[in-house]
Amino acid sequence: MNCLYQRDCLRLLDFTTAELKHIITLSEKLKKTKQNRQEIKLLKQKNIALIFEKESTRTRCSFEVAAFDQGANVTYLGPGSTHLGTKESIEDTARVLSRLYDGIQYRGHNHKTIEILAQYSTVPVWNGLTEKFHPTQLIADLLTIKEIFPNRNFSDIKCAYVGDSRNNIGNSLLEAASIVGLNLYLVSPKQYWPEKNLFIECKKIIKKNQGNIICTENISEGVKNADFIYTDVWVSMGEHHKIWKERIELLKNYQVNDSMIKMTNNSKVKILHCLPALHDQKTSIGKSILKKYGLKDGMEITDNIFQKHQKTIFEQAENRLHTIKALLVSSLIKEMNF
């Protein structure tokens, strides 16, 4: 029987090394079948609930297209369209949806909510993003890394994550690196290093997988000889403007720009970004933030670097679809002959 059948995905430490690599391998296969228009609909007569307390582009589209490609039906429950935690308890919502659906995706503010959903649900629950973790993004990132270096072990690859290392991407990247043995440098001011207990937990795991995790404030040390530089936006729209000012001031030297690229000593270094990116002033939010804080050329990444590396960044975005599809198939199909 498929060992991932009926399994939740709340965080990447829910999986063993073999299980996570299986999902990545299945993602590669499903990507090829879609590209070759040979997709087999394995999820016919399956129904999936998509709970979005936070708005989304890539995550929602990826879950919906993945489900449709595989023959499943979805119900989108957007912000304000459920009674979750207000008129109806999270526990009761989980019990009700489990009677109607074969799986539940949740994207919201509080990780505790998805833990309760999973506890009281009798069907798989998948984390589309919480304030603590973003596992589906990191599975896509690992697929992207593997596609770029198909013949290298993760333990032979160095990834430098620059910016806020304690956010959900930083946390999930820490977990991903520990499971597959990626050499990860978290390049941030000390205030933005990961939570201590999570770091210690991942440090223990990565020793078994031949990789390493290092936190440093030193940008040149952190990015030297990196195969990948990964960044993310520094501010969230739900945070107070006072936090923005403090964070931008502390992180402005950690912008991915020409100077940082030179520090890598690697002319072939690749850039990863989970998107959306504040690299120009073509959005109302981007224009407002960059003008308000005197940022002339992007925030976390300059437009020049973003455009040079857009092929990798948008391949990374597309891979959300294929990896989420692999996650759905893995947890909803009992016997897999694929």
UniProtKB/Swiss-Prot annotation:
Q: Name one GO biological process term.
A: L-arginine biosynthetic process
Which compartments is it annotated to reside in? Cytoplasm
What are the recorded GO MF terms, alphabetically? amino acid binding; ornithine carbamoyltransferase activity
Q: Where, in this chain's numbering, is L-ornithine bound?
A: N168, D232, S236, M237
- Annotated binding of carbamoyl phosphate, by residue: S56, T57, R58, T59, R107, H134, P135, T136, Q137, C274, L275, R320
Q: What is its main location?
A: cytoplasm
The alphabetical list of record keywords is: Amino-acid biosynthesis, Arginine biosynthesis, Cytoplasm, Transferase
- Output the InterPro entries linked to this UniProt entry: Asp/Orn_carbamoyltranf_P-bd (IPR006132), Asp/Orn_carbamoylTrfase (IPR006130), Asp/Orn_carbamoylTrfase_sf (IPR036901), Asp_carbamoyltransf_Asp/Orn-bd (IPR006131), Orn/put_carbamltrans (IPR002292), OTCase_ArgI (IPR024904)
Q: What is its EC number?
A: 2.1.3.3
What does the sequence similarity comment in the record state about its family?
Belongs to the aspartate/ornithine carbamoyltransferase superfamily. OTCase family.
* Function of the molecule: Reversibly catalyzes the transfer of the carbamoyl group from carbamoyl phosphate (CP) to the N(epsilon) atom of ornithine (ORN) to produce L-citrulline.
Task: State the protein's name.
Answer: Ornithine carbamoyltransferase
